[in-house]
Every structure is written in structure tokens, then in C-alpha cells.
UniProtKB/Swiss-Prot annotation:
Interacts with TLN1. Interacts with TLN2; interaction stimulates 1-phosphatidylinositol-4-phosphate 5-kinase activity. May compete with beta-integrins for the same binding site on TLN1 and TLN2. Interacts with ARF6; interaction stimulates 1-phosphatidylinositol-4-phosphate 5-kinase activity. Interacts with AP2B1. Interacts with AP2M1; phosphorylation of PIP5K1C by CSK disrupts the interaction; clathrin competes with PIP5K1C. Interacts with CDH1. Interacts with CSK. Interacts with PLCG1; interaction is abolished upon EGF stimulation. It comes from Rattus norvegicus. It is found in: Cell membrane; Endomembrane system; Cytoplasm; Cell junction, Focal adhesion. This is Phosphatidylinositol 4-phosphate 5-kinase type-1 gamma. Phosphorylation on Ser-672 negatively regulates binding to TLN2 and is strongly stimulated in mitosis. Phosphorylation on Tyr-671 is necessary for targeting to focal adhesions. Phosphorylation on Ser-672 and Tyr-671 are mutually exclusive. Phosphorylated by SYK and CSK. Tyrosine phosphorylation is enhanced by PTK2 signaling. Phosphorylated at Tyr-635 upon EGF stimulation. Residues 75-443 form the PIPK domain. GO terms for cellular component: adherens junction; cytosol; endosome membrane; focal adhesion; glutamatergic synapse; phagocytic cup; plasma membrane; postsynaptic density. The modification Asymmetric dimethylarginine is found at residue 459. Keywords: Acetylation, ATP-binding, Cell adhesion, Cell junction, Cell membrane, Cell projection, Chemotaxis, Cytoplasm, Endocytosis, Exocytosis, Kinase, Lipid metabolism, Membrane, Methylation, Nucleotide-binding, Phagocytosis, Phosphoprotein, Transferase.
Length: 688
């Protein structure tokens, strides 16, 4: 472990000396002369035309005479090269060591390696100035990377294979931002106090990620330091919240406060300005509308993250919100008359787990699983007040600000001049409560018109939609309702009531039907009830192996009844008639007269011819009255007599059989083993 001494610029907390303070210093002081020379060197020439941002300095970030960005007077190209050399060596060296559990002392270990310009037996030669590269808590950060599914080779390929890209609009923090060419990681320079606070935060951060990796908090993948020329430049590697391949039409930095929370005129002149709270409330008074499941998942994630930040006494953090307007991009493409560059190079999903906004609130990805790739690029589907389809990319940023003495003093001073509840700097408990209330009530709102449907990942997961184009996404009207009475299986087929659900089977299956067969084929029920399910032909039904059998009884030549076992024709259904026990039932005729049905104990079933086209219709329970009654007469034998029942005419009458004991028209008689008591069933196949 090494003890670091902060450089003289960092010890001042302000980070840099302004030009006015430098010119007012005493001319005889050596420090004042040094600062004057530095400022004069960075000042633009009088005869030349200054470039954009030339000669201006914000914190440690500045621009040299050639127009290149500098950080602590180190050029951006030098800093990028040193970062890639250092990370390439440390990560490669760490991957050769065996993995082990994270120990408490691992959070405070600092490894250091010297990189001379001429090279050494461990480091390659380079054309930069000699520098020392430090890695903070390498074992702990290796665990974090594994937790998010980032392999060492992928980490090295993203950071070291191609040059880093500097962001042109870094913000007002005075930091320099780099993004990898694959949009996977962001590299940000941090202050000494911020790096120190992150080191203290690591044990609690480790515990929080173990409990729940789905969070909107920054995902830290590494903390490093480049030491050169007496300067310590500390950088942190994080997840990229706003991918460059997705065009952001709006960008907001939201804190939940109102004091000076409006974008300046200078900021609005930028190509992609960063708007603030008052701008959001003015431009989007209706907020961002989400469906109920998405809103619930987002609110729970925000609530959990706010509690974590409050427990660490963190404040002054923000919600970075990027809005991609799908409808606006389609209008822009139609106006241009050609496809944009986004179509030429199809976006590739991020490799890290839980790195997108959609995964952070929804989950669904586990360690080692492949992430579903769709054209939403991890954005959260939403709708604005005008009904336009949006994709939201969100994340909580700037969490390395603790409520120290300087922040307490800042809040006290601002509270004396303005309303203390409106300023951004506040105690952590109040800040977290105000932040959560603003996000859950003003920014994000639940819309009753937007409904989600349970997907294959279970209830609460977002609706999985395969878009047709790079900017296609589901709209509000295309999302089916979640509270539907009709159940859908994975194939989208509707499930009808099965034989076991009715409780009174009339047909005995040869073999127990599978789950798919049970949901795709229904079985006949009793005629006394109002439901009549028409079986559908299943792929397992064949003429050689029918699914159902039935018994028939007929009179032989000697006058004795005979039983026969037949394979059930799939073009027929068997209906069983069950009179009420002990009560005579009168079936009215057309003129109102009736015939008394014999008492209980009589029961039979008949074969009813069904048209083949009717098998594709809905169950007869959805119809009623005479229109749904079978048109074919039903013959049955009860109490020593033959009876004929006409469902269409609702008439029951006794008939006289022929000398052979069978009906005159040659119809077959169906035997029901549940109610026929003259002869017990003896065939073993009837019990299958």
C-alpha cells in the first residue's frame, strides 16, 4: 500500500486559480509569476482568431495553444495513451493470478507500476513522458466486472484496442470524459477527494451490488491514477448511460430542485444542450408516460437507490435522462428522403449485464446469460404528452459528493438568501426524499391507457417486442392488456376447458393427454349443462391410434344384447342425457303439451353427427336457446323401452323397435358405463 500526497493544485479544493486572481497576485512572488506565465501561455494570440473554447479553463480542464484539451496541463492525447498502456498491463497481469474471494483489505490495496519512456523488462517503450500508473483495489474491481458479466478480454478489447474518443460536451464539472469506440465504457477524470470517497465507498458498494445488481447507480469497473510531472490524474471507468449510436433528441440533468435549475442561453446554443429541472417542467408538463409495470419497476429501483445513497450520506447527485424520439426521427428521415447513417451500421447491444436502463429496472438477465438484442438498445419505452413514442436512457450520476463541511457551509449560505428547500445542496435525507418525489410524480407518470402484457419472463417483465426497423418500437395502442380474462400460452393459442376440469368425463382417453394436447383439444361435456366443447384435431390423433373409445350395445340375431368396442370417430361427439333423480321431467311439445319422462335410473348417450366445419367454431357455451340445440334426434333405451328425443322440437316420445331389437332406421345405441346398471363393465380397456 502506498501513501499518496495530493499535488499542490488539488490541496486548494478549488482545483485551479482563476485569471483574475493570478493577475492580482504580487508581482514579486514566485508562485504568482509562475501562474502568470501559465495563463499567458494559454491566452489566445491577439492577431490570431481564437478557436472554440481556446484559452478558457474550467477546473483542471483547459485548452492549450494548439486547441487540444488539457487536464492539469497534460494533453488529452498523452493522457489517453497512458491510460491505455496502464490498463492493458494491470488487467493482463491480474488475469494470470488465480481468482479468490474478496477480502476486506482488498478494498484498500493500491498497486503501482512505473512506465519509463524507453521501456523496461515489464513495460513497453512509449513516446510519452515517464509516468507511474496506479490501480486501486484491483481484486475488488475484478469482482465487480465479473458481476456484470465483463470478461477480461472484452474489457481490454474495449479500452485498449482502439483509441479513446473524447466527448465534446463534457459538462460543467471540469472533468474530461472519454468513451470507448464500442460505446461500452466511459472514462472520467475525478478529483482527489472524489477518488478517496470512492475508496471508502467500495465495501458498502460491494454489499449493495451483491444484494441487487439491478440499479440505476453508476457501475464502477475500475479506479486508476496516472502520475506524471508531480501531478496525479485519477480516472474512473464506468458504464455508458447514453450510447452514441442512438440519437438523443433531448438531454436533461435533473435533481428535483428549482434554484438556478434552468439551462443558460450559452448552453442552449449547443447542438445537444443539457436542460435542467425548470426546463423539463416547462417543456413537458405532462411528464413521461409509462405503462403500469414499467412505472412500478422504475419507481422501486429509484426508491431503493435513494435509500442507498442516503445511507452513505451522499447528496447533490443527478438523474441523467436521454430522450430518443422515435416519431421525430421517422419524420426527419422522410424529410431527408434517405436512410440515415444509423441504418448503415446496425447498433450492437452492450456486452455488460444490467448496463442499460431497461435491464437496470427490469432485470431478466443473469450471470452468464445472453442479453436479448433489439433495436431499442436498452431504452425504456415511453410516450410524451403529444402521444409520440420515446425511448428513455437514464442513470444516476455524480454520486461522489458527500455532505462534508464545505457542502454544509454552502447550503447554509444559500438558505440565508433563498428558500432552503429549493437549493440543490441539502442534507442527504431531505435530498433523497425530494429527489424521489420529483422523479416519481413529475418526471415519470403512470398512464392508464398504456398497458403491458406478461411476457415469457413472468409477470412484471416488460413486453418483449421484435421491431421491424432500427427505430421501431411498440406504441401505446399496440400493447395488449395485462388483465385479460382469456389466457394465452406461449404459442398464443387459446386454452379451452379440459375433460378433467369439468369433473364428469363421458369419454375415457386411451393415454393421458399431454399439456399441449390438453390445451389444444377439448372434450365433449354433458348435454344438461350449457357448455359443449368441440374437440379439435391434434397432431397425435391418427386413424390407427384414436385417442378415445366408446361402447355400443345392440341386439343380436338371437335377441340377446351384445356389446362392441369402437374407436371414436373424430367427426362425432358423444352426448350423455341425465334426467334428475326421482322427479318426472316434462318436455313440452310445440303446442304446449308434454310427455312425462320415466323416473331416474334411466340414462343413455347417443351419437350426434357434427359437421366438420363446426369443429373450428367456438364452444357452444357462448350460444344459447334453440339455435344451438342439435338438429339430430337422440335415441336411447331406458326402463325397458326405446325413447326418441328431438332437441330441435323439444319433444320426447316412445318408439317401437323392430323385431331385431334395434331402431327402425338402423342407428347405433350407445352404452354409458356410468349409468347403465344391467351389466357391469368387464373389458379391461374401458378403464384406461
Amino acid at each position: 500500500m502506498e501513501l499518496e500526497v495530493p499535488d499542490e493544485a488539488e490541496s486548494a479544493e478549488a482545483g485551479a486559480v482563476t485569471a483574475e486572481a493570478a493577475w492580482s497576485a504580487e508581482s514579486g512572488a514566485a508562485a504568482g509569476m509562475t501562474q502568470k506565465k501559465a495563463i499567458l501561455a494559454e491566452a489566445p494570440l491577439v492577431t490570431g482568431q481564437p478557436g472554440p473554447g481556446h484559452g478558457k479553463k474550467l477546473g483542471h480542464r483547459g485548452v492549450d495553444a494548439s486547441g487540444e484539451t488539457t487536464y492539469k496541463k497534460t494533453t488529452s492525447s498523452t493522457l489517453k495513451g497512458a491510460i491505455q498502456l496502464g490498463i492493458g498491463y494491470t488487467v493482463g497481469n491480474l488475469s494470470s493470478k488465480p481468482e479468490r474471494d474478496v477480502l476486506m483489505q482488498d478494498f484498500y490495496v493500491v498497486e503501482s507500476i512505473f512506465f519509463p519512456s524507453e521501456g523496461s523488462n515489464l513495460t513497453p517503450a512509449h513516446h510519452f513522458q515517464d509516468f507511474r500508473f496506479k490501480t486501486y483495489a484491483p481484486v475488488a474491481f475484478r469482482y465487480f466486472r465479473e458481476l456484470f458479466g465483463i470478461r477480461p478480454d472484452d474489457y481490454l478489447y474495449s479500452l485498449c484496442n482502439e483509441p479513446l474518443i473524447e466527448l465534446s460536451n463534457p459538462g460543467a464539472s471540469g472533468s474530461v470524459f472519454y468513451v470507448t469506440s464500442d460505446d461500452e465504457f466511459i472514462i472520467k477524470t475525478v478529483m482527489h477527494k472524489e477518488a478517496e470517497f470512492l475508496q471508502k465507498l467500495l465495501p458498502g458498494y460491494y454489499m449493495n451490488l451483491n444484494q441487487n445488481p439491478r440499479t440505476l447507480l453508476p457501475k464502477f469497473y475500475g479506479l486508476y491514477c496516472v502520475q506524471s510531472g508531480g501531478k496525479n490524474i485519477r480516472v474512473v471507468v464506468m458504464n455508458n448511460v447514453l450510447p452514441r449510436v442512438v440519437k438523443m433528441h433531448l438531454k436533461f440533468d435533473l435533481k428535483g430542485s428549482t434554484y438556478k435549475r434552468r439551462a443558460s442561453k450559452k448552453e442552449k446554443e449547443k447542438s445537444l444542450p443539457t436542460y435542467k429541472d425548470l426546463d423539463f417542467m416547462q417543456d413537458m408538463p405532462e411528464g413521461l408516460l409509462l405503462d403500469s409495470d414499467t412505472f412500478g419497476a422504475l419507481v422501486k429501483t429509484l426508491q431503493r437507490d435513494c435509500l442507498v445513497l442516503e445511507s452513505f450520506k451522499i447528496m447533490d447527485y443527478s438523474l441523467l435522462l436521454g430522450v430518443h424520439n422515435i416519431d421525430q426521427q421517422e419524420r426527419e428521415r422522410q424529410a431527408e428522403g434517405a436512410q440515415s447513417k444509423a441504418d448503415e451500421k446496425r447498433p450492437v447491444a452492450q456486452k455488460a449485464l444490467y448496463s442499460t436502463a431497461r435491464e437496470s429496472i427490469q432485470g431478466g438477465a443473469a450471470r452468464g446469460e445472453a442479453i436479448e438484442t433489439d433495436d431499442t438498445m436498452g431504452g425504456i419505452p415511453a410516450v410524451n404528452g403529444r402521444g409520440e413514442r420515446l425511448l428513455l436512457h437514464i442513470g444516476i450520476i455524480d454520486i461522489l459528493q458527500s455532505y462534508r463541511f464545505i457542502k454544509k457551509l454552502e447550503h447554509t449560505w444559500k438558505a440565508l438568501v433563498h428558500d432552503g428547500d429549493t437549493v440543490s445542496v441539502h442534507r442527504p435525507s431531505f435530498y433523497a426524499e425530494r429527489f424521489f418525489k420529483f422523479m416519481s410524480s413529475t418526471v415519470f407518470r403512470k398512464s392508464s391507457s398504456l398497458k403491458s402484457s406478461p411476457s415469457k419472463k413472468g409477470r412484471g417483465a416488460l413486453l418483449a417486442v421484435k421491431p421491424l426497423g432500427p427505430t421501431a418500437a411498440f406504441s401505446a395502442s399496440q400493447i395488449p392488456s395485462e388483465r385479460e380474462d382469456v389466457q394465452y400460452d406461449l404459442r398464443g393459442a387459446r386454452s379451452y376447458p379440459t375433460l378433467e376440469d369439468e369433473g364428469r368425463p363421458d369419454l375415457l382417453p386411451c393415454t393421458p393427454p399431454s399439456f399441449e394436447e390438453a390445451t389444444t383439444a377439448s372434450i365433449a361435456t354433458t348435454l344438461s349443462s350449457t357448455s359443449l366443447s368441440i374437440p379439435e384435431r391434434s397432431p397425435s390423433d391418427t386413424s390407427e391410434q384414436p385417442r378415445y373409445r366408446r361402447r355400443t350395445q345392440s341386439s343380436g340375431q338371437d335377441g340377446r344384447p351384445q356389446e362392441e368396442l369402437h374407436a371414436e370417430d373424430l367427426q362425432k361427439i358423444t352426448v350423455q342425457v341425465e334426467p334428475v333423480c326421482g322427479v318426472g321431467v316434462v318436455v313440452p311439445k310445440e303446442q304446449g303439451a308434454g310427455v312425462e319422462v320415466p323416473p331416474s335410473g334411466a340414462s343413455a348417450a347417443a351419437t350426434v353427427e357434427v359437421d366438420a366445419a363446426s369443429q373450428a367454431s367456438e364452444p357452444a357455451s357462448q350460444a344459447s336457446d334453440e339455435e344451438d340445440a342439435p338438429s339430430t334426434d337422440i335415441y336411447f333405451f331406458a326402463h325397458g323401452r326405446y325413447w326418441l328425443f328431438s332437441p330441435r322440437r323439444r319433444r320426447l316420445r316412445a318408439v317401437t323397435p323392430s323385431h331385431t331389437g334395434a331402431p327402425t332406421d338402423g342407428r347405433s345405441w350407445v352404452y354409458s358405463p356410468l349409468h347403465y346398471s344391467a351389466r357391469p363393465a368387464s373389458d379391461g380397456e374401458s378403464d384406461t
